[in-house]
Amino acid sequence: VVVKAGPALRGIYVKTARGIRAAARRVGLLARLDRAYQRRPSSVAGHLRTLFAIHDVDDLVHLDIPWWTYGAIRAVERRLVELDGSARVFEYGSGASTVWLGNRSGEVHSVEHHAGFAEVMRRVLTQADLDGTVQLHEVAVQQSPHPVTRSGRKGEDTVDYTDYVRCIEGVGGLFDVVVVDGRARVACCLAAVPFLAPDGIILFDDSQRPRYHEGIEGSGLEVQRIWGWVPSLPYPRQTAVLSRRAGG
């Protein structure tokens, strides 16, 4: 079952979660849930704590967790542990995951198209003491009557994400982990393949969305689809982990 939440419903949920979080803090429940989360993030109580962090990058950073399925988080963390903190990472779409990756990698490049959120992320990265590890690339989108690279989102028919997608080319080199969790995801995934290290992985979030299926399957990579609960959401989603085929 795929659950879709429109902007209005999502707004109501976020507002309600913030109100309940404030009440939970006053009565001491939030502190108890914090302790449960620290013991086991994916437990029922741990997941309940994350529901209060919806669309709150500071709270997600506090919880030290990205916004992917728990199974995908474990898969990426295993790869980062194998590389013993030396991983080179490229990320499409910044957020709490940028800090999470920065704390576990040697070098992170994250591209962000939204100027306002890029400013928020610069503050967050400085507070996390990650300015030396994470480089945030702010790349504005272009308006065009005939965009070359579309996002597929409603209301963005004249928005061109070509520069955003090609940011990885400007950085260059091979990456151990590539995260595709921003806009124009199919184009980003395909652009990242030539820059993927032989044992590297691509994390493609929200892979349950129909508009992503053809691009994922056409990447030429092995695809592991991980369905499950996601921090801060009351319903499950899917995150795909892509890797090179054996002998490929």
Question: Where do the protein language model's features map onto the residues?
Answer:
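Internal catalytic-core helix/loop-beta-alpha segment
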Residues: 136-191
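Membrane-proximal basic amphipathic "stem/tether" segments
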Residues: 1-64
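SAM cofactor-binding core of SAM-dependent methyltransferases
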Residues: 70-145
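Short, well-ordered alpha-helical scaffold segments within catalytic/effector domains
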Residues: 66-77, 95, 162-165, 186-189
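Short, basic, glycine/proline-bearing loop/turn elements
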Residues: 57-62, 82, 174-178
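Conserved phosphate-coordination/catalytic loops
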Residues: 63-71, 155-159, 182-183, 233-236
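C-terminal substrate-binding/active-site "lid" region of AdoMet-derived donor-dependent transferases
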Residues: 168-172, 177, 182-248
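Short, charged/polar micro-motifs that form catalytic or ligand-binding hotspots
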Residues: 62, 66, 87, 91, ...
